[in-house]
């Protein structure tokens, strides 16, 4: 109402126009010797455990499969993920990462802080957009809906003399997985 607007204006202390804004998440720097968790949308309390990282090159990756040793125990990450491919990044330490985006120079100078890092969704990018936005849009557009990129073991069973066959049913193609056993128990599924 007019009375409400007048009351607001009379009691106004000050207004400041904001030019640059960004969504942010807690910053998680990739660090050798750290154990990262694979992303799991059923876990509450994110961002703990750490399931994403920002590298020294300001590339952001999502951990889709944790590195594991021959007995199925989680191992620390020792190889920093690199590259901006639309495919998964497999590192020598057994981790599998999904490249998400690069924090460009402009975003880094304004929103990258010691405790937080910017995130964004690119609706559309054109030839006048920063290269980081064009690459991010390419990555977003290459995402495959309902793609199986990891399998979590909830019960490894017992008594296996050899690795059982892993069958993936669905409407896609080329999905393969191999079971890893230790002591007669399935301890890992490698995609």
PLM feature spans:
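Extended assembly-interface regions of large multimeric machines
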Residues: 1-60, 64-71, 77-123
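Acidic glycine-/aspartate-rich tracts in secreted/extracellular proteins
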Residues: 65-76, 156-158, 170-173
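Conserved, function-critical positions that sit in or immediately flank catalytic
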Residues: 93-191
């Amino acid at each position: 109402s007019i009375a409400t607007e007048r009351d607001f204006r009379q009691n106004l202390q000050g207004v400041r126009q904001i030019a640059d804004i960004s969504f942010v998440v807690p910053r998680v720097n990739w660090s050798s010797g750290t154990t990262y968790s694979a992303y799991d949308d059923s876990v509450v309390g994110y961002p703990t455990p750490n399931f994403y990282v920002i590298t020294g090159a300001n590339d952001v990756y999502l951990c889709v499969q944790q590195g594991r040793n021959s007995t199925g125990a989680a191992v620390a990450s020792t190889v920093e993920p690199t590259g901006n491919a639309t495919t998964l990044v497999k590192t020598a330490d057994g981790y599998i990462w999904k490249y998400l985006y690069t924090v460009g120079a402009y975003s880094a100078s304004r929103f990258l802080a010691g405790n937080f890092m910017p995130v964004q969704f690119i609706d559309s990018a054109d030839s006048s957009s920063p290269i980081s936005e064009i690459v991010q849009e390419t990555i977003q557009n290459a995402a495959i809906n309902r793609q199986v990129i990891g399998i979590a073991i909830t019960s490894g069973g017992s008594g296996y003399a050899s690795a059982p066959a892993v069958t993936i049913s669905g409407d896609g193609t080329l999905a393969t997985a191999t079971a890893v056993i230790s002591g007669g128990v399935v301890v890992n599924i490698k995609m």
